[in-house]
Each structure stands twice: as C-alpha cells, then as structure tokens.
Amino acid sequence: MTAGMRNSSRAARSALILVAAGVLAVGCGSGSGSSGASGGSSSGTGTAASQVPTANLPVLKSIGKGEGTLNLIAWEGYLQPEWVNPFEKQTGCQVHATYAGTSDQMVALMKNGGGGQYDMVSSSGDADLRIIYAGDARPVNINLIPSWKQFFPAFQSPAFNTVDGVHYGVSLQWGPNVLMYNKKDFPAPPTSWSIIYNPKYKGQVTVPDNPIQIADAALYLKTHNPSLKITDPYELTQNQFQASVKLLASQRPLIKKYWDLASQEISEFKNGDATVGAGWPYQVSALKGVKFPIGAVVPAEGATGWADTWMLAAKAPHPNCAYMWMRYISTPKVQAEQAVDYGETPDNKLACPFMNQIQQGSCEEFHANAPLSYFKSISLWKTPVATCDNGQPDCVPYSQWQQAWTTQVTQ
C-alpha cells in the first residue's frame, strides 16, 4: 500500500485474510474487531455530525458523460492494469495515479478538498474521519452504486466513512497487518509479535514508518502487560500510551528500515537485509510471486488491520468519472480481481465465485467461512481522538501519536 506501481504476479496469492460471510453479516460487535465497521456515527470522535463542513453539499442525481480523466490517490497495488485498463476502455476515463505511503500522506494530499486536482482517495479507517471533518470529502449518492447493496452489512454504512447517515465514499476491501518472516531463517512460523522486539534480531527487523504502529505496540502490551488494562489499542490513556511508545523506542536499535513504501519492504527481504517484520498481504503476495521463501502469520496476540474506502474529494474535478469508478470497483468481479491480486478481503459478498475463477480454491484459501473469533482478532485502524468511546476525555489524540513517533521512536 504506497507509492510506486507494484508489479505483482497473478500467481502469487496470499492466504492471510480470514473472514466469513456469516461474520460480516453479523457486523462488528464489540471488541477489537469492532473499531470501524458498525453504525453510522462519528465513531467516537466526540465531534457532532453537524460539524462536517461538507455535509450539506449536493450530490449527483445521475451520472453524466465522463470527463475523460480520473485522478486518484491510492495505496500501491490498488490500481493494477488487470482492472484499470478495462475501466478506461469502458468509460473513456483515463486513470492517473498518485501513490501514498501512509494515511498521513493521504490526508495531506486531500487538503483543501483535493485542491481541485484529485478526485478520490483510497483511504483507510485511520484517515477517513480526519478527511471528512476537515471538509475535504463530499457526500456520495450511494444509490448510484448498485453493487453497494451486495456488500456485507458491516461495510455498507460503516462508522469510518458514514456520518449521521451521510456517505462520503464507498467501502472497498479490508485485511490484517501481518507478521512476515523469511522461512529459511524461521523453519517454524513465529507465534508472537515478540519476535520483532527481540534483541536477537538486531538490524533484521522492518516495520512501517507510521505513527499508527503505536497501536500495534499497544495490542502487544494488551496481552503481555495486562496491568496496563488496555482494551482498545486506539484508545490509550497517557500511561498506556507512554508504555507503548517506550516499547517502540526500545525496538529502534533492532530496525533495519522503517519502510515508507511497500516496495521498500519487498526489497529489504529480497536483498536479505530483513528477516522479519510487519507488513501487508501485498508484500507477501509479491514476494511469493518471485518464489521468495516468505511466510506470514497473524500471531496469537491478534493484529491491527485496515478497512479501505474510495472517498470523493470535496473539489473533485471529474465527478462523473469518479462515480463510474465507484460503480466499477464495487462489482463482484472487480472486487475479486483486487482481492486475489492483493491478498485482501472484498466487501462484496458475491465476489467469492469470481475469486475461484481467477484461482481455484482461493475463496476457501482466504477462509471466507472463518469463525467470528478471527474477525474479532483484527483491530481495524481508526483515528485516535481525545474523547474515548466512553465519553471521557482521557485518551491521547492522534496529534500526540505523530509527535511521539517522530521525536521518541524513529529519531
């Protein structure tokens, strides 16, 4: 997920995303898996829906003639020729991609409503509400996207992209952040995230250069330091926050590279510079595609993860092409193509047969009938805010996460 087009092999398929149709039909209950896929509120931002600056902007009533251009901000790997080229031929909308390496970069690119340059962004749950409440996304007429009705209920109007019943985009895919390892160095799969904090692997660890990693540390401490009483890795008291930052600061001497781009982590493993690290199914898929002995697991402590949305920029210069894209990318066939190529889970519940057409058994391989317990083991990204979900102003806001990451962790 970042900058620079990824040349992934269609033969490289990740078997890491485990979620069932029955799971998503239930929705995201309480606990770690519930952070972004329920309701239609501000998801604990403490900000009233009336404060969304663009809430009353008019929406398209019908899709008109395409403008010929579509400017997208995307995670690396989200705009592969397999599905972009047919879209361009069908619509006449030529896709121009700008790749971002972090959610912070996406938020920055979307400032001032995309600046009249960008049409859409494939943002994750830790960025969506920042973009929405900054007035940089505009409401979407979900009725112009027929395949939206085929989505699992949990992703039709999730709290990370829908505020007070107003949609600011259309859900796309979701997946976990996984523990990657070189099978030659680890004949037996690691079972705990503790391996990336182990001094034994000094200079061999790679993790994202992203403040949201503080949540990964908090999730680890939730199990290994229960006295902290962490219940949600994105809602941390000052004491819980400092403990998580301290753990990451102690990890710094072990880090070979804080990667900004997915392609950087791929290179670290291919070159033998990294033997273990935190990454996405995309990197796993790409490395498998070149026959690299990569392994990946969701350890016993669980994992953080993302749920992505194609959000419409407030000043999108090509709205008709943007709506055409949302309609196209939401269809089961295209969702299946991206899911199998990237190694993530589609939001369209009808994508499964198309996945098996692309790669026989891939729907089962991605554990589409996984138990609810797996879904709950994934803590989906959301924006840390000062007001906790219990209404108390005891949580550390994201601005302090950013500051701690740059001043206490990576430097």
Which residues are covered by each model-predicted region?
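C-terminal motif of bacterial Sec signal peptides marking the signal peptidase cleavage site
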Residues: 23-27
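Bacterial signal peptide processing site
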Residues: 29-32
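Conserved C-terminal helix/tail region of periplasmic/extracytoplasmic solute-binding proteins
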Residues: 41-45, 375-411
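Early extracytoplasmic/lumenal segment of secretory-pathway proteins
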Residues: 44-131
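Extracytoplasmic ligand-binding site segments that recognize negatively charged/polar headgroups
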Residues: 71-80, 105, 117-118, 122-270
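Paired acidic/hydrophobic, glycine-rich loop segments that form the ligand-binding mouth/hinge
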Residues: 117-122, 258, 275-280, 295-296
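Extracytoplasmic/periplasmic substrate-recognition and gating elements
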Residues: 279, 288-341, 411
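Mature extracytoplasmic/periplasmic domains
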Residues: 313-379
